[in-house]
UniProtKB/Swiss-Prot annotation:
This protein's UniProt keywords: Secreted
Name by which UniProt lists this protein: ESAT-6-like protein EsxR
Organism listed in the record: Mycobacterium leprae (strain TN)
Listed SUPFAM superfamilies: EsxAB dimer-like
Classification lineage: Bacteria, Bacillati, Actinomycetota, Actinomycetes, Mycobacteriales
Pfam families on file: WXG100
Domain of life: Bacteria
Length: 96
């Protein structure tokens, strides 16, 4: 039987990187919204109404994506910590 080895520091680092990426995605979404808000001033009539509806959808989708990515990062971190705690408890039983 082969022993499976986990690199917990690398796994926790990866979870941290995921959180950082979620923050970066949020920043990009804010930048895009700001650019498009500047364009909105030029749009009127049906185009302006369409823009407003589209912007609401865009903002909601961006928020959902960022929330989901944060949730994935938190789940990854929590599961890694749970695995680490369990491994340490098992090792303690064997004197390791």
């Amino acid at each position: 039987m082969t022993q499976i080895m986990y690199n917990y520091p690398a796994m926790l680092d990866h979870a941290g990187n995921m959180s950082a990426c979620a923050g970066a995605l949020q920043g990009v979404g804010i930048d895009i919204a700001a650019e498009q808000a500047a364009l909105q001033a030029c749009w009127g009539g049906d185009t302006g109404i369409s823009y407003q509806a589209w912007q609401v959808q865009w903002n909601q989708a961006t928020e959902e994506m960022v929330r989901a990515y944060h949730a994935m990062a938190n789940t990854h971190q929590n599961n890694t910590l749970a695995m680490l705690t369990r491994d340490q408890a098992e090792a303690a039983k064997w004197g390791g």
